Structure formats: C-alpha cells, structure tokens
A protein has these predicted regions:
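Conserved glycine-rich cofactor-binding loop
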Residues: 9, 16-18
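Short C-terminal tail/terminal secondary-structure segment
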Residues: 144, 225-226, 237-251
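Active-site helix of classical SDR
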Residues: 119, 155, 163
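A glycine/serine/threonine-rich, flexible loop-to-helix segment
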Residues: 1, 49, 53, 172, ...
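Short, small/polar-rich loop/turn modules that mediate ligand/substrate recognition or access, typified
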Residues: 171, 176, 236-238
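Residue(s) in the substrate-gating loop at a strand-loop-helix junction
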Residues: 139
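Alpha-helical segment proximal to the catalytic Tyr-Lys
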Residues: 124, 168-169, 234
Length: 251
C-alpha cells in the first residue's frame, strides 16, 4: 500500500532510539523527509545520517523538550529545512514512574507540556499543509490502571484526553489528531531491557500478562503511527490506537 507520504515533511520528538527511531525510519522508508530531536547530539547526528542514506531530506538537533524555547527553535528550524510541516509526532516521555513531587513535575514538563508546546509551535505550519496530522504517543498506562499508576499513568491519560479535544478543535482546519498507546515495548537499551536485567521478577510478571508471550517491538508501534499520520488515514481523527497485542482488557 502506498501511504502517500513521499515528499511530505514529518517531525518526531525523541527520534534517536526506540519507538521514536522506528517511527523516523519508517517515515523515511515511505519517502517522507524527516526531522528529529533528542538530548544526545551524537545520537541525533548518527540517525540523521542514516535517514539521509535512504534518499530523503533529514535534519536534527539536540534538544531538551522540556525547554519551550529550545523546542520551538527546533520546530521552526525543521520547517525551514524541510520546507514546511505535514505531520508532527510527539513521542518523548520522561518515563517518570513514582509518586513524588519530582516525578510529577518531570512528567508534567516532559510528557504533557512538551506535547502542548510542540502542537502550539507546529500549528502555523500544519495549517498550510493539505494533509496535516498530529500524533501523540501515549501508553496503555493511560488507558488502564497498572503498575505505572501515579505521575506516568496520569499524564498519559491526560494526553489521550488532550488528543481527543484537539481533534475536535482542529478538524475544521483540516488537521487530524490521533493518539497511539503502546503496550510493553522491548528494545536494546530500553526500559524493559533494564527491568529484565535489574528486576527480573517484575519482568517475568509483565511477560506473563502478555497473551502473545512476548513484548512488542518499536517497529510494530511505528507501523500504527505512520499509518495514522498518512493521507491514507484521512477519515481517522480523534482515535486512540492501542498497540498492545491484546494486553489490555478494557472495552
């Protein structure tokens, strides 16, 4: 299936590893020009080189997405480098699990406000696109209460609500908004690999809850994200796509 992304411009926050990297790579594989940001400049540079090797325009910058000015600067720079913005994927999470003032503040600034600020900065460019879309990466922890209850789950739930509200507000401008909620996703250097090594009992419990007998891959999440972002999904807005291999049970 041709997703109609060739020549489109896609921005991905947290695009240097894991789910964000898989999303950026799939956009590039579909012919889209891609801009990424992450905190590590060397990792950003390596990803940009890899994306450019696929024959598309690619650009990136080291950014702390909790800094609104730096985030806006990256978005403005990406629009200038790529010639506009057709889609933005708000993917970064602090992964701050816990119930302390510090974890609540970190989740608020990184998960919630990076998304709000990204949308605000990208809107002037999205309004000029003929196939504009916003994808907000949430989590099944925002859909069902689980071991990540607390700041992480609460703000992931808020992101789903925010995406739904935005979809209603922006559809008249031709901008679609959807959320994607991954279940347990395993990759090299990711949180589940760290849990597997440091807390094997917790990892074993999590694995036992997965009906497929395994965790998901970043590429499986990316497939849902890129499809929803594409013109092929032109009638889909306001949904929360759950990519969890039947992990959650809520209707």
């Amino acid at each position: 299936m041709d997703l109609g992304l060739k020549g489109k411009s896609a921005l991905v926050t947290g695009g240097s590893k894991g789910i964000g990297l898989a999303i950026a790579e799939l956009f590039a594989a579909e012919g889209a020009n891609v801009a990424i940001c992450a905190r590590n400049a060397d990792e950003v540079g390596n990803v940009v080189k890899g994306l450019s090797a696929k024959g598309v325009k690619s650009w990136g910058r080291a950014v702390d997405v909790a800094d609104p000015d730096a985030l806006k600067g990256w978005i403005d720079g990406a629009a200038a480098e790529l010639g506009g913005i057709d889609t933005i994927v708000c993917n970064v999470s602090a992964l701050a699990v816990g119930d302390t003032a510090e974890t609540w503040e970190k989740s608020f600034r990184t998960d919630m406000m990076h998304t709000v600020n990204s949308v605000a900065a990208a809107l002037p460019y999205l309004e000029k696109s003929k196939s504009a879309s916003i994808i907000i990466v949430s989590s099944v922890s925002g859909f069902e209460v689980d071991v990540a209850a607390g700041s992480y789950g609460a703000f992931k739930a808020a992101l789903i609500h925010y995406a739904k509200g935005l979809s209603n507000q922006l559809i008249a401008k031709g901008i679609r908004v959807n959320a994607v909620s991954p279940g347990n996703t395993y990759f090299e250097g990711g949180i589940w690999q760290n849990i597997e090594r440091g807390m094997p009992d917790l990892y074993k419990t999590a694995m036992s809850l997965n009906p497929t007998g395994r965790m998901g891959t970043p590429q499986e999440v990316a497939a849902g994200v890129v499809f929803l972002a594409s013109p092929v999904a032109s009638r889909i807005s306001g949904t929360n796509l759950i990519v969890d291999g039947a992990l959650t049970k809520a209707v």
